[in-house]
Amino acid sequence: MFIDNIYDQNIYTNIDFLDTNKQKNKKSNNFINHFQKALGEISNIQNNSKKNIEKFQSNHSDISLNDIMINLQKSSISIELAIQVRNRIISAYKEIMNQQI
């Protein structure tokens, strides 16, 4: 039985291959982290809008109707943006899945 010499194996190529996979995972995790961060910001905007509405309804003098309307528009636009991003991601996924190999 013949056993290959260990010196004939290119270990550095294998290490580079593993490092490339780590970089790909970091890139995909980076996208996921950005997306989760954006969703968290959208949630914060909506929560701030709700809190400001409750303050306005309880007659706090530091909140005006203009601030309420601006916050509502911000939350509406952020939700629309999130929906558009989701739709684009889904359409890109469907396009990739429909490609023939």
Curated annotation (Swiss-Prot):
Record-linked HAMAP family: FliE (MF_00724)
Keyword tags: Bacterial flagellum
TM helices/strands, residue ranges: none
Family: Belongs to the FliE family.
Encoding gene, per UniProt annotation: fliE
A Pfam family matched in the record: FliE
GO terms for biological process, alphabetical: bacterial-type flagellum-dependent cell motility
UniProt key word Isomerase: no
Name of the protein this chain belongs to: Flagellar hook-basal body complex protein FliE
Coiled-coil region list: none
The keyword Methyltransferase is annotated on this UniProt entry: no
Localization per Swiss-Prot or TrEMBL: Bacterial flagellum basal body
Primary localisation category: other
GO cellular component: bacterial-type flagellum basal body
Disulfide-bond pairs as recorded: none
GO terms of molecular function: cytoskeletal motor activity; structural molecule activity
Annotated organism of origin: Buchnera aphidicola subsp. Schizaphis graminum (strain Sg)
